[in-house]
Every structure is written in C-alpha cells, then in structure tokens.
C-alpha cells in the first residue's frame, strides 16, 4: 500500500536516528565539522610527536575522521594492535586490502575528546617499544 513499508520497520533504529540528527542540529553542523577538524589535528600532531609517519602527510588531503599511520620498520602490527586492545583497552584498526599489514588507524569520528586521544598516545608510548619500535 502507498505510504506503508513492506515489512515491520526497525523503530528503535528510526528513533535513534531521529535523536542523533537532533543532537547534530543542536550542536550546529559547522561546530561538528570544526570539532572533527580539531581532534583530527590533535591526533596527527600526537602521532608526529611519537616519531611515527602518517600515511597522508599533506594536510590538505588528511581525513578528519580517521588517521592512518605507517607501521614502522621492525614493528609487528598485529602485536601492536593486540597489546593496545588487551593491555590498554584501546582498539586500533588495521589497514585494508593491499595495505592490511602496512598501516594502523586511529578513529576520531563522533564523540571523541582530546582526553580520549591523549590516552591513545600514552598507550602507544608504552606499547610501541614493546613491539619493536626504535624511534
């Protein structure tokens, strides 16, 4: 029938989406974009301070939602990600496709604060030398 869904819609998802959109509009889209740009820059700066190399070094092309970092020579990416998760409760994403073992990623989309990223950086300071980082 016209105006009807062909099956029972997921009302919880609809209500969740409605609330999420309200939150975005309350904050203001320009503020949301600015917050993401700020936390992304904070993340990239922290990565550089650790002596790590960003996959995308040109700020004009860097993402404001996720930061990709090259796995340093001699570092076991799986060990890095495993120790971060099990010992520091920090989940890093690996690369995808042909870069699956070459990079790891730090996500900073949504409700991610500077304190959250600072915790990630502190954990990386501890774990990186344990998995072969010589920087």
Label every model-predicted segment.
Residues 84-92, 125-131:
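A common structural junction motif
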Residues 53-87:
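Conserved PLP-binding catalytic core of the aspartate aminotransferase-like
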Residues 24, 66-68, 105-110:
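Short glycine-rich or small-residue beta-strand-to-loop segments that form or flank ligand, phosphate
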Residues 1-45, 49:
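Active-site C-terminal subdomain of aminotransferase-like
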Residues 98, 102-135:
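PLP-dependent enzyme catalytic core of the Aspartate aminotransferase-like
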Residues 27-35, 51-58, 95-96, 132-135:
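Flexible, glycine/charged-enriched surface loops at secondary-structure junctions
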């Amino acid at each position: 029938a016209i105006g009807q869904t062909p099956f029972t819609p997921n009302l919880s998802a609809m209500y969740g989406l409605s609330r999420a959109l309200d939150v975005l509009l309350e904050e203001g889209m320009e503020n949301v974009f600015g917050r993401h740009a700020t936390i992304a820059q904070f993340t990239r700066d922290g990565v550089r301070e650790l002596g790590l190399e960003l996959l995308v070094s040109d700020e004009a092309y860097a993402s404001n939602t996720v930061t990709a970092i090259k796995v340093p020579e001699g570092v076991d990416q799986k060990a890095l990600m495993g120790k971060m998760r099990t010992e520091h409760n920090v989940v890093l994403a690996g690369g995808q496709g042909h870069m699956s073992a070459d990079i790891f990623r730090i996500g900073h989309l949504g409700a991610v604060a500077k304190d959250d990223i600072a915790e990630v950086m502190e954990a990386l300071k501890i774990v990186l030398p344990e998995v072969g980082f010589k920087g």
